[in-house]
A protein has these predicted regions:
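Macromolecular interaction modules
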Residues: 1-117
Length: 117
């Protein structure tokens, strides 16, 4: 694959009783399918973690109010990847549309252009 010029971030919460199937489908189906889409450089999942950091000379606890628990970060060659036929097929394949997507909420989708190498 080519050089990542954009980052697409999909974030969401999931109903607690569907968390196990959410994680299984995301790891074993959804991410592997999207990684095969032309123009996708990488795809990685993450989960919100507690944050303490130095700000203004003191350690502060940062509370991310309303921030979704789960995110996936996709490095893309260009934003056209997101409107490609291959992307459309990948995001609607497997168990994701029927067994996972209906149980997600607080969904956020953002696209960011990378500005340095």
């Amino acid at each position: 694959s080519g050089k990542a010029n954009y980052v697409f971030i999909a974030s969401m919460d999931v109903d607690p009783e569907k968390e196990a199937v959410f994680n299984e489908v995301y790891d074993k189906e959804h991410i592997p399918l999207i990684q095969k889409v032309p123009g996708v450089v990488s795809a990685r999942r993450n989960v919100l973690a507690p944050l303490k950091m130095f700000i203004g000379g003191e350690v502060k606890t940062i509370v991310a109010e309303g921030e979704p628990k789960y995110s996936a970060i996709y490095e893309l060659e260009n934003p056209d990847v997101l409107t490609s036929e291959a992307w459309a097929k990948a995001v609607d394949a497997g168990r994701w549309p029927s067994e996972v997507r209906p149980y997600t909420r607080n969904r956020r989708h953002t696209l960011r252009k990378l500005t340095n190498d």
